[in-house]
Swiss-Prot record:
Assigned EC number: 2.4.1.120, 2.4.1.177
One GO MF term: hydroxycinnamate 4-beta-glucosyltransferase activity
Residue positions binding an anthocyanidin: H20, G380
Stored CDD domains: GT1_Gtf-like
Keyword Membrane set for record: no
TM regions (residue ranges): none
The protein's name in its UniProt record: UDP-glycosyltransferase 84A4
Top EC group: transferase
Source organism of the structure: Arabidopsis thaliana (Mouse-ear cress)
One Pfam family of this chain: UDPGT
Catalytic activities: (E)-4-coumarate + UDP-alpha-D-glucose = 4-O-(beta-D-glucosyl)-trans-4-coumarate + UDP + H(+); (E)-ferulate + UDP-alpha-D-glucose = 1-O-[(E)-feruloyl]-beta-D-glucose + UDP; (E)-caffeate + UDP-alpha-D-glucose = 1-O-[(E)-caffeoyl]-beta-D-glucose + UDP; (E)-sinapate + UDP-alpha-D-glucose = 1-O-(trans-sinapoyl)-beta-D-glucose + UDP
Length: 475
C-alpha cells in the first residue's frame, strides 16, 4: 500500500456513454501502465451497473495495469434516464461537481495530480480550476470536428442559420468546404439535438483551461487540420495520441468498460467463413434505425449474396421503442449478436467491409484495421466523419447522408454498395487505401512515432512534480 500511495494519481471523469467511456478507459489503462494510479469515474446510470455486471468490476479496488494501477468509482446522478438530454446534463453537472470533489477528498492521501475529462462533461475543468488541480481533456472526435466547433463558437466563418439553412461552410483545411448536412449536425439550427452541440461548445469555451487537449487521432491522418489549429490557437496544446485502441493492445489487462458481455463465439464463427466474405454491421450504442430501414438493409444483404455479422442492440432501458426484427433467412445466413469485441472482428480476414454509423471510435478502428467502410451516418460528428472517409481518407462509400435526409435507403442500393465495396476495382482501391492508413496508424503508436512521443511527453509532465506545480500556478 505504501508503494501505491507514492505513485502519481490521475482521475478520469467520463460522460456515461459507451462511445465516451471506451476511449477514455483506453487512455486510463495506457496512463496506468506507465506507473501511475488511475481512478476512472462515471455514473451509476445508465451504464455503470451494466459495466459492473459485464466486467466483474469492484468499486474502488485497485487492479494492476502494467507498472501502475486502475480502479473504478461510480456515483449517483439522481436522474432517471429518459430522452431528455438537457435534464440529464443539468443533473449530471450538479451531482458531478459535488461527487468529484468528494472523491478528490476521499483520496487525499493519494493526491489527485490531474483531472482528465471528455467533452460532454466540460464542467470538470471548472472543478479542477477551483481545486487548483491541473486538467486535461480527451477529445474523442476528429480534429476536423474540433475545428468546426471552434470556428462556429468564434464565428470565424458563416454557418447555416434558420434563415439560411443550406449555407456551405468554407474551411482552410481538407476538404475545404462542408455542405450544410456535412457539418456536425448538432450545429445545424434544424437539429432536434442542438443542446448536445451546446454542451460541446461549453468545452470549446474552456479550451484555455486544460494544459493539454489530447485528441483521439494521429498526425498523419489529419496533419493539415492539426497544424492549422495549432497555429490558430498557439495558447492551446493540441496533442494527437491515437489510435488509442492500437496503443492499448500492447497492455496485458482484463479491464474492460463494455456494457454487455461480448458474444463468445464471434471469432469462431468468423473462422468458419471464407476470406473477405462477411459484412460487419454495427450502428453503435445510440443510433436506432427505423424498422423499415432495417428491413431494407437486411434484404440488401440477402440480395448481395454476402454473409453478415450484425450487432443489433436492444433499445436502451426507459425508451419506448420496440426491438428490431430481422428476417429468419438472414439469421440463418449470418450471425446476429447484441455485442462483440469490434476491434477483434475488424481485424479478422473474413471481414470484407464495415457498414457503419461512422462514429469516431468505429471510424478509427476501421481505418487502423485496414477495412473499407460503407457510410450510414445518422447525426452529430458521424455525418462529418463520413465525408472524410469518402473524400479525404478515401476508404468509404456513401449509403446515407444522415438522419436529416429523411429517406429510407432501398435494398437495391444497399446491395449495390455492398458489392461495390467487396468486388471489383473500387473494392481493391478502398482496401489498398485502408491498408495504407493501417500502416500509418501502427507507425504513429510505435516507439518514436508521433502519437507515442506526444503521449510520453504528456505522461512525463504528469510524473514530474515540478512541472505539474508550475502548470497549477499558471491555471
Amino acid at each position: 500500500m505504501e508503494m501505491e500511495s507514492s505513485l502519481p494519481h490521475v482521475m478520469l471523469v467520463s460522460f456515461p456513454g459507451q462511445g465516451h467511456i471506451s476511449p477514455l478507459l483506453r487512455l486510463g489503462k495506457i496512463i496506468a501502465s506507465k506507473g501511475l494510479i488511475v481512478t476512472f469515474v462515471t455514473t451509476e446510470e445508465p451504464l455503470g451497473k451494466k459495466m459492473r455486471q459485464a466486467n466483474n468490476i469492484q468499486d474502488g479496488v485497485l487492479k494492476p495495469v502494467g507498472l501502475g494501477f486502475l480502479r473504478f468509482e461510480f456515483f449517483e446522478d439522481g436522474f432517471v434516464y429518459k430522452e431528455d438530454f438537457d435534464l440529464l446534463q443539468k443533473s449530471l453537472e450538479v451531482s458531478g461537481k459535488r461527487e468529484i470533489k468528494n472523491l478528490v477528498k476521499k483520496y487525499e492521501k493519494q493526491p489527485v495530480r490531474c483531472l482528465i475529462n471528455n467533452a460532454f462533461v466540460p464542467w470538470v475543468c471548472d472543478i479542477a480550476e477551483e481545486l487548483q488541480i491541473p486538467s486535461a481533456v480527451l477529445w474523442v472526435q476528429s480534429c476536423a470536428c474540433l475545428a468546426a466547433y471552434y470556428y462556429y463558437h468564434h464565428q470565424l466563418v458563416k454557418f447555416p442559420t434558420e434563415t439560411e439553412p443550406e449555407i456551405t461552410v468554407d474551411v482552410p483545411f481538407k476538404p475545404l468546404t462542408l455542405k450544410h448536412d456535412e457539418i456536425p449536425s448538432f450545429l445545424h439550427p434544424s437539429s432536434p439535438l442542438s443542446s448536445i452541440g451546446g454542451t460541446i461548445l461549453e468545452q470549446i469555451k474552456r479550451l484555455h483551461k486544460p494544459f493539454s487537449v489530447l485528441i483521439e487521432t494521429f498526425q498523419e491522418l489529419e496533419k493539415d487540420t492539426i497544424d492549422h489549429m495549432s497555429q490558430l490557437c498557439p495558447q492551446v496544446n493540441f496533442n494527437p495520441i491515437g489510435p488509442l485502441f492500437t496503443m492499448a493492445k500492447t497492455i496485458r489487462s482484463d479491464i474492460k468498460g463494455d456494457i454487455s458481455k461480448p458474444d463468445s463465439d464471434c471469432i469462431e464463427w468468423l473462422d468458419s467463413r471464407e476470406p473477405s466474405s462477411v459484412v460487419y454491421i454495427s450502428f453503435g450504442t445510440l443510433a436506432f434505425l427505423k424498422q423499415n430501414q432495417i428491413d431494407e438493409i437486411a434484404h440488401g444483404i440477402l440480395n448481395s449474396g454476402l454473409s453478415c455479422l450484425w450487432v443489433l442492440r436492444p433499445p436502451l432501458e426507459g425508451l419506448a421503442i420496440e426491438p428490431h426484427v430481422l428476417p429468419l433467412e438472414l439469421e440463418e445466413k449470418g450471425k446476429i449478436v447484441e455485442w462483440c469485441q469490434q476491434e477483434k472482428v475488424l481485424a479478422h480476414p473474413a471481414v470484407a467491409c464495415f457498414l457503419s454509423h461512422c462514429g469516431w471510435n468505429s471510424t478509427m478502428e476501421a481505418l487502423t484495421s485496414g477495412v473499407p467502410v460503407i457510410c450510414f451516418p445518422q447525426w452529430g460528428d458521424q455525418v462529418t466523419n463520413a465525408v472524410y472517409m469518402i473524400d479525404v481518407f478515401k476508404t468509404g462509400l456513401r449509403l446515407s447522408r444522415g438522419a436529416s435526409d429523411e429517406r429510407i435507403v432501398p435494398r437495391e442500393e444497399v446491395a449495390e454498395r455492398l458489392l461495390e465495396a467487396t468486388v471489383g476495382e473500387k473494392a481493391v482501391e478502398l482496401r489498398e487505401n485502408a491498408r495504407r492508413w493501417k500502416e500509418e496508424a501502427e507507425s504513429a503508436v510505435a516507439y518514436g512515432g508521433t502519437s507515442e512521443r506526444n503521449f510520453q511527453e504528456f505522461v512525463d509532465k504528469l510524473v514530474d512534480v515540478k512541472t505539474m506545480t508550475n502548470i497549477n500556478n499558471v491555471v
